[in-house]
Amino acid sequence: MWELLAKGDPEVYEIVMKELGRQEEGLELIASENFVSPAVMEAMGSTLTNKYAEGYPRRRYYGGCKFVDEAEQLARERVKKLFNCKYANVQPHSGSQANMAAYLAVANPGDTIMGMSLSHGGHLTHGSPVNFSGKLFNIVSYGVDLETEVLDYDEIERLALEHKPKIIIAGGSAYSRIIDFKRFREIADKVGAYLIVDMAHFAGLVAAGLYPNPVDHAHIVTSTTHKTLRGPRGGLILTNDEELYKAINKAVFPGIQGGPLMHVIAAKAVAFGEALKDEFKEYQMRIITNAKALAKELENLGLRIVSGGTDTHLFLVDLNPKNVTGKAAEKALESADITVNKNTIPKETRSPFVTSGIRIGTPAVTTRGMGESEMKVIAELIVKVIDNIQDEKGTIPEEIREEVKKAVHELTEKFPLYKDLT
């Protein structure tokens, strides 16, 4: 596939090949990562990358947009069908930019926004002080009940009544339970707030009908197009309100972006088309089954799972009982070709760069075709590594590392990833 790259720039080609090898040989358990289809990849590498197309279909600031208009319109129509909504903007370059545009469509800098605390499972763009959201807006954070580790809706309502936010954000990057969007909308209506749902992590589950559709309750829904949706890296915004749609479009362009990435939008259209097929629902069902099985097996082997389990594609592991940090666990596992990410947890006492937990997700290994029996093997390998961590650097005995790495490679060889890309 990359013959011209190999000939024209051997250095970049070598990097691409090394990354391909890493993905093929390793176990990818980062919850926000997945493997796109070759068709999605081809669309991203198409001639559409050459075209500037500021504006929207049939309302561009450049000529020659006849065919990119078709690509964007196709992406819009497919995603509207996928999520049963009236209006869609598929131009955001990322989930973060989708969130920024959604906020600026209905609020002004200095307004109050309520979002889930990062340490409780939220996202940087939900009000972190180091993010644009925390710098532009007055932030009120909510979280989970520290005993049950699930959302405390009564406390969320109390905070909303006290602070009267302009926006309430629901959704997160590390929350493993089903979110009650109906309750969130009731709270928002009580204080006259806009409800914005960030479904970036569970969009694929929503598309498959395995997670409540936030479009039914939210004023605005944002998402990435990768993660469980298994498309290219990018963002999207949905709404059923025509006036909000107009405001969203202005916020995206000319508000925060210039020319859209038409090659990525075409790849989004391909991914949405794939998600409309029956086999996509079966795939999403396997993701959840695998996540539940992996969490349960890890628990059986002595690890503590935050909130006691998962309803989705991901879960958090509390490493405090093991006296191991998330940073050390991430490094140790990566040395054995298992990738996870360190993650803050409720009652967090460590820095976000160290953390007390790790986040684990099953979309990527499910894409490879792995099932419950493989989750049992993976759990055993994870625990073997964690139980043998010797220091904060994530050092493990060489014989353990090589034993686990060998088992990982034997497993991934049975479930090849991209057969025709080398």
Swiss-Prot record:
Its EC number is 2.1.2.1. Keywords: Amino-acid biosynthesis, Cytoplasm, One-carbon metabolism, Pyridoxal phosphate, Transferase. It comes from the Bacteria. It is found in: Cytoplasm. Its main location: cytoplasm. InterPro entries: PyrdxlP-dep_Trfase (IPR015424), PyrdxlP-dep_Trfase_major (IPR015421), PyrdxlP-dep_Trfase_small (IPR015422), Ser_HO-MeTrfase (IPR001085), Ser_HO-MeTrfase-like (IPR049943), Ser_HO-MeTrfase_PLP_BS (IPR019798), SHMT-like_dom (IPR039429). Its cofactor is pyridoxal 5'-phosphate. GO terms for molecular function: glycine hydroxymethyltransferase activity; pyridoxal phosphate binding. The keyword Secreted does not apply. One of its GO terms (cellular component) is cytosol. It holds the Pfam family SHMT. Coiled coil: none annotated. It catalyses: (6R)-5,10-methylene-5,6,7,8-tetrahydrofolate + glycine + H2O = (6S)-5,6,7,8-tetrahydrofolate + L-serine. The modification N6-(pyridoxal phosphate)lysine is found at K227. The record marks H226 as: Plays an important role in substrate specificity. One of its GO terms (biological process) is glycine biosynthetic process from serine. Pathway: One-carbon metabolism; tetrahydrofolate interconversion; Amino-acid biosynthesis; glycine biosynthesis; glycine from L-serine: step 1/1. (6S)-5,6,7,8-tetrahydrofolate binds at L118, G122, H123, L124, E243, S351, P352, F353. Belongs to the SHMT family. Catalyzes the reversible interconversion of serine and glycine with tetrahydrofolate (THF) serving as the one-carbon carrier. This reaction serves as the major source of one-carbon groups required for the biosynthesis of purines, thymidylate, methionine, and other important biomolecules. Also exhibits THF-independent aldolase activity toward beta-hydroxyamino acids, producing glycine and aldehydes, via a retro-aldol mechanism. Homodimer. This is Serine hydroxymethyltransferase. It comes from Kosmotoga olearia (strain ATCC BAA-1733 / DSM 21960 / TBF 19.5.1). The gene is glyA.
